[in-house]
């Protein structure tokens, strides 16, 4: 019913993108997006301008019957997404909240080591008048954008289909001249929207102003494709030998690999590093040779590796940095100090 109220049920239903089922007590869908559900929650709980602005977010799975599913995490029928929704008392406050979220998203991608370009785009079925995509330049991407020489401004080629695209670009995004812009392929990692009063008008959601008037909410919508962002990180950090996770998001800092004869030394080092808060994993598979273990862990992408061979006495350990392939021999305390400095780069530490 809330999808029918917003006017989007028929659009999603007829496009075939929505997973749904008809039951005796009504039709149900697996959420492809959450604007309607969030709006209903806010409409029933926020009544006054004093309650605004509000920004709510969630991280969870979305379901879309993608007609062009491809590339594993790049475009799948079930994916993880971080989506946020802001509610404001005026268009000016919406614009302010939008700019804060845009800055936050750019900082998130920068922390992840991904260079993204904010790209002017059409709002499409979402509604509203302004939206920007966060694009990661990649030849494997299926989106095409036009980018300026400095890679600081860009817009989606779909805008060129508008009759007044030059006026639109100038008015809303400050782009005057596109003669030097060139086509690039990219992957869309995030999208933010100024939805205005589209949903509050169709779904009848209002708040009391300071003059006691009923005013429809001004709404913003923001999303990051978590699954797709992981795919972009993998693409950017892949070598012929395998993946190399960036230090700050790798599930472990270090892999310990050892020969059967050096099991005791390996586990002493493992216990010591764990006690110091180092994120370490040890390969205790008995059936594999040392070379096979090394090959496996290079595929999995842990950024540092200690290989304990038959000649290791336990006084010093060879540390390999996967990023540049360099190796150094370090005493146990020096190894702990080195990895401790590396761990400070981890998100959340």
Name each model feature, range by range.
Residues 1-349:
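NTP/phosphate- and nucleic-acid-binding module
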């Amino acid at each position: 019913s809330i999808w029918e109220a917003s006017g989007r049920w028929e659009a999603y239903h007829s496009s075939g993108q929505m997973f749904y089922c008809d039951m005796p007590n009504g039709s149900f869908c697996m959420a492809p997006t959450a604007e309607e559900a969030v709006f209903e929650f806010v409409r029933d709980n926020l009544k006054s301008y004093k309650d605004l602005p509000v920004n709510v977010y969630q991280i969870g799975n979305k379901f879309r019957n993608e007609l062009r599913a491809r590339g594993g995490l790049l475009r799948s029928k079930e994916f993880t997404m971080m989506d946020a929704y802001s509610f404001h008392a005026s268009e000016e406050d919406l614009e302010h909240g939008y700019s804060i979220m845009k800055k936050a998203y750019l900082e998130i991608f920068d922390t992840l080591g991904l260079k993204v370009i904010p790209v002017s785009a059409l709002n499409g079925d979402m509604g509203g008048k302004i939206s920007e995509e966060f694009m990661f330049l990649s030849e494997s991407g299926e989106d095409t954008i036009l980018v300026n020489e400095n890679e600081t401004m860009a817009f989606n080629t779909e805008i060129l289909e508008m009759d007044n695209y030059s006026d639109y670009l100038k008015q809303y995004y400050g782009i005057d001249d596109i003669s030097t812009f060139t086509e690039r392929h990219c992957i869309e990692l995030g999208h933010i929207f100024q939805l205005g009063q589209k949903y509050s008008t169709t779904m009848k959601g209002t708040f009391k102003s300071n003059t006691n008037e009923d005013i429809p909410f001004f709404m913003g919508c923001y999303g990051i494709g978590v699954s797709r962002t992981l795919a972009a990180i993998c693409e950017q950090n892949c070598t012929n030998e395998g993946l190399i996770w960036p230090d700050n998001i790798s599930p472990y800092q270090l892999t310990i690999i050892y020969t059967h004869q050096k099991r005791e030394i390996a586990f002493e080092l493992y216990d010591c590093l764990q006690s110091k808060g180092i994120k370490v994993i040890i390969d205790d598979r008995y059936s594999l040779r040392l070379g096979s273990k090394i090959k496996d862990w290079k595929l999995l992408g842990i950024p540092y590796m200690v290989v304990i061979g038959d000649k290791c006495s336990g006084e010093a350990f060879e540390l390999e940095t996967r990023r540049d392939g360099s190796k150094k021999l370090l005493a146990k305390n020096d190894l702990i100090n080195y990895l401790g400095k590396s761990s400070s780069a981890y998100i959340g530490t």
